[in-house]
C-alpha cells in the first residue's frame, strides 16, 4: 500500500507499540476483529481460557487460533501468539515447538481451517514438536 511504500507505516507501528490496534489488519487472508472489538474479544478469550483448570495441547492450539483471529496488535501478533503457545506448553509440561518458515503455509492453512478440520494445525505443530523432541533426545533432556 502507498503508506508503507513511503515509509510511514513503520512510523505508525512505533506509535502503537503496546496498545491494541487502531486500524484493521489481517492474517493469512483472513479477516480479524475490528479495532473497536478487540478489548471485549480479548477479555472473553482470556476468561474462557483461564477458566479451564488444566490445559492440554488442543486447548493451547485453540487459544492460539482465537488469538490470531482477533489479531489484537497492529504488528507482531504471530510472534506474540507463537511465543504464548511456547510458554503455555512449558507451563503445562508439553514439549514446546517452533513453527519454522518451511511450514508456515501449512500453519496458515491450519489457522484458517481450524473450525472445520483441527488436524491441519495439530499435525503441523506435532511435526515440529517431534523435531524439538529429537533435539531433547540428542542432548538427553527428559520430557
Please describe what each predicted stretch is.
Residues 1-12:
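Single conserved hydrophobic/aromatic residue that forms the stacking wall/gate
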Residues 22:
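Conserved catalytic-core motifs characterized by acidic clusters
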Amino acid at each position: 500500500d502507498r503508506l508503507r511504500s513511503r515509509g510511514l507505516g513503520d512510523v505508525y507501528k512505533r506509535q502503537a507499540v503496546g496498545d491494541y490496534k487502531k486500524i484493521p489488519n489481517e492474517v493469512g487472508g483472513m479477516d480479524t476483529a475490528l479495532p473497536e472489538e478487540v478489548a471485549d474479544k480479548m477479555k472473553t478469550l482470556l476468561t474462557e481460557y483461564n477458566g479451564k483448570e488444566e490445559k492440554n495441547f488442543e486447548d493451547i492450539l485453540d487459544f492460539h487460533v482465537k488469538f490470531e483471529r482477533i489479531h489484537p496488535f497492529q504488528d507482531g501478533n504471530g510472534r506474540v501468539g507463537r511465543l504464548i503457545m511456547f510458554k503455555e506448553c512449558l507451563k503445562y509440561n508439553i514439549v514446546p515447538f517452533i513453527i519454522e518458515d518451511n511450514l508456515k503455509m501449512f500453519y496458515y492453512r491450519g489457522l484458517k481451517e481450524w473450525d472445520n478440520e483441527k488436524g491441519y494445525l495439530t499435525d503441523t505443530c506435532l511435526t515440529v514438536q517431534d523435531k524439538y523432541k529429537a533435539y531433547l533426545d540428542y542432548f538427553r533432556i527428559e520430557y
